[in-house]
Amino acid sequence: MAYYRTPHDVTALPAWQALQQHRDAMQGFSMREAFAADGKRFEEFSLSSCGLFLDYSKNLINEQTRDLLVGLANEVGLADAIKSMFSGEIINASEGRPVLHTALRRPVGDKLSVNGVNVMPDVHKVLNQITELVGRIHDGLWRGYSEKPITDVVNIGIGGSFLGPELVSEALLPYAQRGVRCHYLANIDGSEFHELSANLRAETTLFIVSSKSFNTLETLKNATAARTWYLAQGGSEAELYRHFIAVSSNKAAAVAFGMREENIFPMWDWVGGRYSLWSAIGLPIALAIGTANFKELLSGAYTMDQHFQTAPFDKNMPVLLALLGVWYGNFWGAQAHAILPYDHYLRNITKHLQQLDMESNGKSVLQDGSPVKTDTGPVIWGGVGCNGQHAYHQLLHQGTQLIPADFIVPVVSFNPVADHHQWLYANCLSQSQALMLGKTRDEAEAELRAKGMNEDDIAKLAPHKVIPGNRPSNTLVVERISPRRLGALVAMYEHKVFVQSVIWGINAFDQWGVELGKELGKGVYQRLVGSLEDSAEDGSTQGLINYFRGRHRG
């Protein structure tokens, strides 16, 4: 039976039991000693593919650990699960949908059927539409109501309609095309719209309203605010189509808003929001970096798809990263995972991976609705490299929690300044090294003694300078961030998340927890504005409503 129809209790599998026994045997494992004993540990636990180099040697593992983890992947039927996803089986069981974001980066000649219909022609038809629109805007042929060319594009969307496109647009800023500036509007906070619109001219601004359903509250409120602003700045309803386009599966609602049908880019229900940057949701990416680079992004993701489907599990980047996450989360008690990019342009990758991982694997029931028997997705957090060293890295080094980390760093900078990049790269490596090595009590005392400190003071200070070490991390190195390598990097994390969901037996492609807050929000809003007099379901919420109503002006 398919894994998504008959979820397993992973804790009852022989492979899981073997890993528990192995975990007990690894209690005293020292990475420092492992490196000292094996001069080829780095070569054994590293690999290269799709323009990415992964060093996973600084982990609490040996070859037996890897073999046992791969055995777990085999026992849960991972190979069949991968085939199920790529072939279009309905693996999103709770919503009755296939999961085919990977189709968006497949070559035009491929065939893939959904409900008996080959979807690849439609996928490439939309890609051609994107190419045509981007060309018209970049060539100055798409003009606003005053016949001036478009200079600014504002993407209005939230969640997956925002985080992925923003990440890629900023990560590939060195590839930005001249003449058009791209902006993002996500939050319903009016201050965000105010600050953005203050620097725009309505006559040269194009808004992209990105919402699969075209009823996402934050997106529609911001779209309405943008339309009101556009009209107040001199635009007309008759010319609205020149300044508003949509990415949505709800064509009727977009037309009712004022878009022309030919300016509405479709979405499919087999593409989830957090996996949608490869679709027309990626239109602002194509506008920012050009369609040639956008297609390179897709191509890079496709190469990772191929690697994921064909590489043996012990040499498969997404699978190995997923298995390491299971190892720490389920056998070492880790509750969080840090993403630490040492690259200014990648500063938003943590936000995208937060949604990708936490919205996908933040689940507590199996595919059949029964409770899980073990912990699932971790908290994903982090931030840009050296800044974090002077903020939260302290907790990574000397805190009481085990928090595995991924370091991401390019070899070449787009903007070399003196020896800055050498120092940046050195900092990245030294942080992973420090997490692994730590500092013993003897080393701390010797260091203080060499500075001439007396023994009484050494005895007092040395315990504070001891760093446990043995903290695991992965290091992902790219020669230079490019569309192709970035596509591979993002796709790698997508597949990592999927692998973990298969092992835990959960559905990575729904997000029912998000819906409850939306439902309750309507009632809270009605009570805030006085259109609903009934009290809230609890005293705390009602008290906060009363506090707002007693003080709010405007």
UniProtKB/Swiss-Prot annotation:
It is an enzyme of class 5 (isomerase). PROSITE patterns: P_GLUCOSE_ISOMERASE_1, P_GLUCOSE_ISOMERASE_2, P_GLUCOSE_ISOMERASE_3. It is found in: Cytoplasm. The active site is at residues 359, 390, 518. Pathway: Carbohydrate biosynthesis; gluconeogenesis; Carbohydrate degradation; glycolysis; D-glyceraldehyde 3-phosphate and glycerone phosphate from D-glucose: step 2/4. The keyword Zinc-finger does not apply. One of its GO terms (molecular function) is monosaccharide binding. Keywords: Cytoplasm, Gluconeogenesis, Glycolysis, Isomerase. GO terms for biological process: gluconeogenesis; glucose 6-phosphate metabolic process; glycolytic process. GO terms for cellular component: cytosol. It catalyses: alpha-D-glucose 6-phosphate = beta-D-fructose 6-phosphate. Its EC number is 5.3.1.9. Catalyzes the reversible isomerization of glucose-6-phosphate to fructose-6-phosphate. HAMAP family: G6P_isomerase. NCBIfam families: PRK00179.1 (NF001211). Belongs to the GPI family. This is Glucose-6-phosphate isomerase. It comes from Pseudomonas entomophila (strain L48). The gene is pgi.
